[in-house]
Amino acid sequence: MSRHVTVVLLLAVVLLLSSHMSHGQHWSYGLWPGGKREVEGLQESYSEVPNEVSFTDPQHFERSIPQNRISLVREALMNWLEGENTRKKI
């Protein structure tokens, strides 16, 4: 039993250390400490985004799944009974 406890404790320590080490800041082009970006880079990226958004008409989808749960159970029961009847005929 003590062997299992030591293995679990060892795994817990490894998990804690690996999660702590993975939260380091990843440096990228144009990033300063704290995740701040240069102002010029932000202005360029915002100028690329169009100011107007075109809205389309909402699409209507037909539902192929019955909403009533009783009908689902009834259909499953009928399929099961049909399967039983075909087995008896064979």
Curated annotation (Swiss-Prot):
Residues bearing the modification Glycine amide: G34
Tissue specificity remark: Expressed in forebrain but not in testis, ovary, kidney and liver.
Keywords: Amidation, Cleavage on pair of basic residues, Hormone, Pyrrolidone carboxylic acid, Secreted, Signal
Protein localization: Secreted
GO molecular function: gonadotropin hormone-releasing hormone activity
Domain of life (superkingdom): Eukaryota
Signal peptide bounds: 1-24
PROSITE patterns named in the record: GNRH (PS00473)
Family: Belongs to the GnRH family.
Protein name from the UniProt record: Trp-8 progonadoliberin
Native source species: Rana dybowskii
